[in-house]
């Protein structure tokens, strides 16, 4: 019949009422003219108008970031935060061609789509740039490092979970267990000079802007090209706060990657911190209560950046 039938509803403790929350799908136009869908959620009593925003993305491996309910989101939504998910190229939301436009030598489309979605929401006065926090993990952590380098003025904070931020170094080492299979997603920089130069132009670790030092030193660590991840020198005060999570037993993204990135960020004067889990793997802590503690810690940092923790 085409009619929806509710078969089961999870119990949510507290005074949760699903009618208190609004959702909407909007479309923004990326810099190359492509239309990007963005999913939005906010509390009915907190109209999305220059709101603090939590914007999250992934955009890799043809994985779809489908909208879904999460109890952990309620705390921020109830404080007036706009929750946004841009369905950027590199994911699988819009079919195979959508994925192909965000992989290998098209990877920068993923970063540009995310930044363009952020700017569109801010320009429409739905979100406030001074209270916007971006989030992504693993390949989405690479996305976070890239967008922080590309458009630091758009974000007050960036949370990067187990981030793949030194991708070039890792993918150049065929002795690592996942390297050769990852060439299908990112390209093979070991044997293809074009892929090497392309990855070098966007890999977060390679493109951290150097702080404007006393005396006028305004060189950049990256190539500073207009279409790359680096955009030239950025004063540390203009760069978003960075929160990194990593795990000592992560076999997918070795902990040395985010910690190298942390060291380079801090040497550039950026307000960057890391939370290191000794016993966790790529998926974070195991055990329901440990996972809730981890989420609450991350949410507390985000709300502090947004000015909502007081």
Spans of features found by a protein language model:
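Active-site-proximal cap/loop segments of hydrolase catalytic domains
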Residues: 88-310
């Amino acid at each position: 019949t085409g009619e929806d039938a509710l078969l089961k509803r999870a119990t949510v403790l507290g005074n949760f009422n699903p009618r208190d929350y609004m959702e909407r799908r909007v479309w923004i136009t990326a810099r190359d003219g492509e239309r990007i869908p963005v999913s939005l959620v906010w509390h009915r009593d907190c109209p999305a108008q220059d709101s603090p925003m939590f914007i999250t993305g992934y955009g890799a491996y043809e994985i779809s970031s489908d909208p879904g309910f999460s109890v952990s989101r309620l705390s921020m939504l109830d404080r007036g935060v706009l929750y946004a998910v841009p369905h950027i190229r590199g994911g699988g939301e819009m079919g195979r061609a959508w994925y192909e436009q965000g992989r290998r030598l098209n990877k920068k489309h993923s970063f540009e789509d995310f930044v363009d979605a952020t700017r569109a929401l801010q320009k429409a006065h739905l979100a406030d740039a001074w209270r916007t926090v971006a989030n992504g993990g693993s390949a989405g952590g690479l996305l976070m490092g890239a967008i922080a380098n590309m458009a630091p003025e758009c974000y007050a904070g960036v949370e990067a979970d187990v981030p793949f931020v030194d991708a070039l170094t890792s993918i150049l080492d065929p002795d690592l267990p996942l390297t050769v299979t990852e060439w299908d997603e990112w390209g093979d920089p070991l044997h293809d000079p074009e892929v090497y130069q392309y990855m070098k132009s966007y890999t977060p670790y390679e493109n951290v802007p150097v702080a404007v030092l006393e005396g006028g030193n305004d060189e950049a660590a990256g190539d500073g090209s207009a279409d790359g991840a680096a955009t030239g020198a950025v004063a540390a005060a203009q760069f978003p706060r960075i929160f990194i999570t990593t795990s000592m037993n992560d076999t997918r993204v070795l902990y040395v990657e985010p910690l190298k990135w942390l060291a380079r960020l801090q040497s550039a004067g950026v307000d960057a911190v890391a939370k290191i889990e000794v016993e966790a793997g790529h998926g974070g802590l195991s055990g329901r209560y440990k996972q809730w503690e981890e989420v609450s810690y991350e949410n507390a940092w985000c709300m502090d950046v947004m000015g909502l923790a007081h």
